[in-house]
């Protein structure tokens, strides 16, 4: 009798396990609702948040469901939440879907963890009240795959915080090799220092950074991509380092406060829109002898400085722009390299005088964007050669 009962119980258990397995398999492809949240089990054994239908003002998105991590915020999953003002995203999330937070009219603050690797198109579109963005890791932020400009919350936000501290002066970490497209789109930063090792500034990386007054670029950069610094209206001076080869279209478009630009000898490509509508430009120093297309720069107070006989001289004359010939080492512009040039550099290095952009370009013999004792040595050598 006991043996028969044991067999029956075993059969019941087997059928129960088979039945439960069927339910689990079915659930993997279905929406699971738990209170205000709906989820979907992904192939990798983690969950995607499909929707949030609550009315909270402060939302801390769950980091797990049924003991498994939530790694994806789905398309439009947290949109149309009229009351939502503050969102904290957990450090399990790696992907924020397209239009995830779209049309949240009251949203003011978002905290984004360093686990996030991609943010889809329009993730923060139509969030007009967005004010403050908190991030944890600047290097990771630089490398996030942003779908477009409105996937970056800086499209609307006016305050940038790194680990709870306001960030206005940005120094890119040395581990970064490329600054992603739209990484700092419209960010409220004031100064920018990019270290040696970064090779590319992505499309629209710093578009509309209207408070940005100073940028320091390394010689490791090969390309300044399309619209990288477009509409950075507070920039007044840019020295592009030797090593840059391509300045893509709209790179400095509508930088209306820009007065001085130095283009190094390494540059082989400039488009007609790269510096278009830089209406305050006064000094354009071109050390490159390549055939560069400057287009309509939009300034009436401009003087171009370049070597005689170059395509840049032809461009200046064809467009009735005042032109001054450059001779490397000829800091005082008298047409020869002599003691007076050495004296001028010495006065500058002692802190008792200044150099114009053109003078600095002539004095910076090795084109390292710095006039220093090495340049004095080269000038001295040229004088007594």
Residue ranges and their predicted role:
Residues 36, 42-45, 54-71, 81-95, ...:
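Structural signature of tandem-repeat unit edges
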Residues 75-77, 97-100, 120-123, 148, ...:
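Consensus positions within tandem repeat domains that build extended binding/scaffold surfaces
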Residues 22-38, 55:
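Low-complexity, acidic Ser/Thr/Pro-rich repeat tracts that form intrinsically disordered stalk/linker regions
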Residues 19-25, 326-385:
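Cellulosome-associated attachment modules in secreted, modular CAZymes
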Residues 145-150, 296, 311-320:
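Short, aromatic/basic amphipathic alpha-helical patches
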Residues 4-23:
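Sec-dependent N-terminal signal peptides of Gram-positive bacterial secreted proteins and lipoproteins
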């Amino acid at each position: 009798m006991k043996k028969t009962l044991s067999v029956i119980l075993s059969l019941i258990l087997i059928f129960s396990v088979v039945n439960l397995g069927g339910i689990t398999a079915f659930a993997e492809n279905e929406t699971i609702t738990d209170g205000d949240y709906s989820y979907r089990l992904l192939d990798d054994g983690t969950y995607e948040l499909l929707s949030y239908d609550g009315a909270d003002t402060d939302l801390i998105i769950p980091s797990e469901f049924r003991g498994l991590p939530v790694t994806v915020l789905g398309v439009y999953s947290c949109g149309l939440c009229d009351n939502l003002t503050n969102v904290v995203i957990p450090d399990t999330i790696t992907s924020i879907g397209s239009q995830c937070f779209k049309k949240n009219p009251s949203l003011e603050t978002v905290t984004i963890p360093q686990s996030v690797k991609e943010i889809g198109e329009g993730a923060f579109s139509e969030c007009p009240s967005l004010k403050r963005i908190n991030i944890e890791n600047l290097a990771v932020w630089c490398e996030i795959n942003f779908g477009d400009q409105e996937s970056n919350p800086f499209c609307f936000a006016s305050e940038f915080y790194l680990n709870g501290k306001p960030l206005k002066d940005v120094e890119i970490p040395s581990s970064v090799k490329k600054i992603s497209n739209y990484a700092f789109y419209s960010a409220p930063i004031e100064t920018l220092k990019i270290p040696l090792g970064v090779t590319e500034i992505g499309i629209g990386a710093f578009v509309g950074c209207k408070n940005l007054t100073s940028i320091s670029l390394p010689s490791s950069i090969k390309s300044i991509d399309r619209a990288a610094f477009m509409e950075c209206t507070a920039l007044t001076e840019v020295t592009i380092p030797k090593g840059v080869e391509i300045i893509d279209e709209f790179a400095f478009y509508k930088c209306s406060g820009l007065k001085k630009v130095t283009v190094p000898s390494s540059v082989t490509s400039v488009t007609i829109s790269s510096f278009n509508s830089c209406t305050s430009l006064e000094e354009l120093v071109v050390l490159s002898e390549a055939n560069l297309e400057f287009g309509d720069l939009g300034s009436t107070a401009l003087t171009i400085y370049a070597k005689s006989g170059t395509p840049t001289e032809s461009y200046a004359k064809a467009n009735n722009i005042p032109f001054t010939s450059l001779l490397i080492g000829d800091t005082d512009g008298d047409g020869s390299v002599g003691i007076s040039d050495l004296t001028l550099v010495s006065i500058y290095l002692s802190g008792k005088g200044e150099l114009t952009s053109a003078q600095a370009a002539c004095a910076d013999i090795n084109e390292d964007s710095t006039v220093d004792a090495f340049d004095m040595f080269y000038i001295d050598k040229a004088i007594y050669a």
